[in-house]
Every structure is written in structure tokens, then in C-alpha cells.
Amino acid sequence: MGLRVFFFGLGYSAGALIRRTPAIEPSGTARLDERVAQLRAAGVEAYTFDGTRADPGLEAALQRAEAIVVSIPPRGGQGPLDRYAEAIAAAQNLSRIVYFSTVGVYGEHGGGWVDETAATLTRSERGLARLADEARWTEAGRTRGIAVDILRLPGIYGPGRNALDKLRRGEARRIVKPNHVVNRAHVDDIAEAARLVLSRGLPGQIWNVADDEPAPPQDVIAYAAGLLGVPAPPEEPFDTSALSPMAASFFAEEKRVSNAKAKALLGFTPAFPSYREGLSALYEAGEGRSV
């Protein structure tokens, strides 16, 4: 019998973890009824939870869990702890909670390397909400003696979500801001880190999960264009790029995220140590080929 894992958010990263770990017996939530129907058709015990309503069977499924993985971001309405704190407390076999957070909580570090001991200097509304959620889940685990792991994640790419597909759709831009780099990780590497956390039995703690090479975003687009044999979009200076507020926010802070702790203590080794290996593998799998 496999590990019973309840996922708050059966989305992109959770799906990769489930595919990578056949021993998991998954159940969990999705926001839309249509997505829940798809998951159930695929044999996954899925329930609707969108912060305002939930399926009646969700609470019973949650109480059977041996581990909980939380990948939904803080948003308006009731979050999992607002609605299900009592059910989580009543889960007799629950031994671990894994919360997917963001490296955005570190905020501005002048382009320097940050590890898990670095100050969390975020001033953005999203980052502060994430920090508050980290604290709430950590406290929920502490009061029950349950290990809580915080996985701080960078930009996620993988099948269907990558620079190759952006080029195919005509959406790729090469925005250049001097000395700016982006931290990223392939979704399969995130899934592997989460699998290790669930299986190693270490005390709950914070983990940075990222590849080995933070890189300028314009270089990533250029590499993808080279794989596809198409011209790279022209470079655009950040100062005159007319980005949306959301897109511009990703250029607001400078840091390089270290994965050294996960390598040393979890035995985490990225299968895709940089965007080059990740994009090359995606290209070989057929991503973006209709350009």
C-alpha cells in the first residue's frame, strides 16, 4: 500500500510528483469542476475546492492522509487552513506537510547568492502573503508535532510551459535588464525534490529548489530559438519595454538562489542543471516544433 498523499492543488507540479512517484496514493483538490471530472476519469480521487466551496467528501479524504502537499497560492476567500484546520488536526496518520512556496520571499539581494538562512526581504504583496502562509503551515505542524517542509521554488518550466512554446505562439520577447538573472527549475526536478522530502524522513525545514545556473532571460529565449532554427526576437531594453505590472515585477528583484543544502542533505541532483539541458530535452520530446 502506497503513501496516502492529499494535494491541495492537483496542478502542474503536483502532477509531475504523482507521475514520478507511482507508490503515492493521491487525492486532492482542483478549483474547477471540469478539472475534477478529468482527474476522476483518470482514476484520481479529486474534489472541488476554490476557497469558497468544497465537495462534501473532501474532509474525509483529508483525514485519511499520511502526508499533505500544498501547492495553491494564498488568494482571496478561505484557504485550506481557514476551512480545514480541524480536519487536518484529526488526521491521525498525518506525519508530514510539504508547502510549495516561492523564492520571491527573499526579495532584493543585489544579485547575490541566497541560501535558506538569507533574510526574507520581500516587500511585494504576493511575497508577504507567501511568508504569512509559510508561518501558518509551520505553526499548524508544530502544534501537532508534524514535520513541515517549505520548498521555495523559482520560475517553473517544463512540458507545455517553456520558451520553445512561447516562440511557437509568437509570445517570446527578449527583455534585457543589465545584470538581471532569473532563477528557474524544471518541473521534473521540483517533483524529484518533493519526492526526496517525502521519503527521507528528515526533520521539517526550508529547502531551496532551483537549478545550478541563474541566467539572463534573453539568453534562454535565444537558446530556444537556436534549437528551433528560427531567428531570436530582437533585444528590448527593459526601461522602454512597456511590460504589464505583473511582468515587470519579475524584473524588480535581483538574487541568485543556491540549491547547495538540498544537494548536501537530500541528495538532490538536478536532472536539468541549467536551462540548456532542460530546453534541449523538451525540444527532443517535440516541444515547439510547429514554429
Describe each model-derived feature in a short phrase.
Residues A193-A194, R200-A247:
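Mid/C-terminal beta-alpha module of Rossmann-like enzyme folds, strongest
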Residues D165-A185, D189:
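A conserved pocket-lining segment of Rossmann-fold NAD(P)-dependent short-chain dehydrogenase/reductase
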Residues L58-Y99:
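NAD(P)-cofactor binding segment of oxidoreductase domains
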Residues L131, R144-I146, I156-R169, L196-W207, ...:
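Glycine/proline-rich active-site loop of Rossmann-fold NAD(P)-dependent oxidoreductases
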Residues G110-I150:
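Catalytic helix-loop patch of NAD(P)-dependent Rossmann-fold dehydrogenases
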Residues A85-E125:
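Conserved Rossmann-fold NAD(P)-dependent oxidoreductase catalytic core, especially the SDR/UDP-sugar
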Residues P273-V291:
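Amphipathic terminal alpha-helices
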